[in-house]
């Protein structure tokens, strides 16, 4: 009987908040980071198009179990809309499908912003990862098919005009999961009667991570010059953020080492005392600052749903 294969790479865990450069795909970025860190597992918390730059949170090791909590968080983008053309991809990459010589006044742009704030119905771009009949919309679009993509509700918490010129307007948006900034540019262009597409897009925030957490890819690649393997990996690991930081919006409990052992074995622990936390469907437990488990608090117990190895 053959022995099970050991996973390749180091069993490290944590978040690397990459400042993704332009013309670099999200999957390509994850592969590069996994290779640099010699990690067993890696995954990202939300695709960033090759023509977009900025924050791409990448989870290594056990941190991949916390990816859904980051994907569901608020995001902030800075973007520029070029007026006068609507394009097939709703950004610079596509072909022009509609054009207009009209250009919007700044007052008209500002007057339009409330329409796109709050819970809105939005149709994703034809070139998107939305599945239609089991196939990705972008695959169908590349084959020349025009498909009906149903509108979806998304939430925009804030939409601000930063500045404008005759052919361009610069915005900042804070939005929830599933919001397509390309669709926003397309729809605003139609409403203003001039058409529009994304000329530049940069993500600056994915809750709970901020701009101060971002690391340029060039800084990480530069560490390849360190010949000593252990020294190079230690320098890379210094950029990692603790796995538990992704859960900072959830209720938290601190446990001792004995309780941590029970939780990691999949067993519940009893929460006693006047300061015992209130029931909640999701909370996370740490021991000595290290993430132990995600679980629910019910009937005076913390019941683990996902456990994390000793980090």
From Swiss-Prot:
Keywords: Isomerase, tRNA processing. The active site is at 49 (nucleophile). One of its GO terms (molecular function) is RNA binding. Gene3D superfamilies: Pseudouridine synthase. GO terms for biological process: mRNA pseudouridine synthesis; tRNA pseudouridine synthesis. InterPro entries: PsdUridine_synth_cat_dom_sf, PsdUridine_synth_N, PUA-like_sf, tRNA_psdUridine_synth_TruB, TruB_C. It catalyses: uridine(55) in tRNA = pseudouridine(55) in tRNA. Transmembrane segments: none annotated. Pfam families: TruB_C_2, TruB_N. Disulfide bonds: none annotated. Its EC number is 5.4.99.25. Belongs to the pseudouridine synthase TruB family. Type 1 subfamily. NCBIfam families: TruB. Responsible for synthesis of pseudouridine from uracil-55 in the psi GC loop of transfer RNAs. This is tRNA pseudouridine synthase B. It comes from Rhizobium meliloti (strain 1021).
């Amino acid at each position: 009987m053959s022995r099970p294969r050991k996973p390749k790479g180091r069993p490290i865990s944590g978040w690397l908040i990459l400042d993704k450069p332009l013309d670099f795909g999200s999957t390509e970025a994850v592969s590069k980071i996994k290779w640099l860190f010699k990690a067993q597992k890696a995954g990202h918390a939300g695709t960033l198009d090759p023509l977009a730059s900025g924050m791409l949170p990448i989870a290594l090791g056990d941190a991949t179990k916390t990816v859904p909590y980051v994907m569901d968080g608020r995001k902030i983008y800075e973007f520029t809309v070029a007026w006068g053309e609507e394009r097939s991809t709703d950004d610079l990459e596509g072909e022009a499908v509609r054009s207009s010589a009209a250009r919007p006044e700044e007052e008209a742009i500002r007057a339009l912003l409330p329409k796109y704030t709050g819970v809105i119905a939005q149709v994703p771009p034809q070139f998107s990862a939305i599945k239609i009949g089991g196939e990705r919309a972008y695959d169908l679009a590349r084959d020349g098919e025009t498909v009906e993509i149903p509108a979806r509700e998304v939430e925009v918490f804030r939409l601000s005009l930063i500045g404008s010129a005759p052919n361009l307007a610069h915005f900042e948006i804070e939005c929830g999961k599933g919001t397509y900034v390309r669709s926003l540019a397309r729809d605003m262009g139609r409403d203003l009667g001039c058409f529009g597409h994304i000329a530049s897009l940069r993500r600056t925030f994915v809750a709970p991570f901020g701009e101060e957490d971002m690391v340029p890819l060039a800084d990480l690649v530069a560490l390849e010059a360190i010949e000593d393997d252990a020294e190079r990996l230690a320098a890379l690991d210094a950029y990692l953020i603790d796995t538990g930081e992704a859960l900072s919006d959830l209720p938290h409990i601190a446990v001792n080492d004995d309780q941590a052992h029970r939780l990691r074995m999949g067993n519940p622990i009893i929460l006693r005392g006047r300061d015992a936390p209130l029931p909640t469907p999701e909370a996370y437990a740490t021991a000595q600052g290290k993430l132990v488990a995600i679980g629910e608090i019910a009937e005076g117990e913390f019941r683990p749903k996902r456990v994390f190895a000793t980090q």
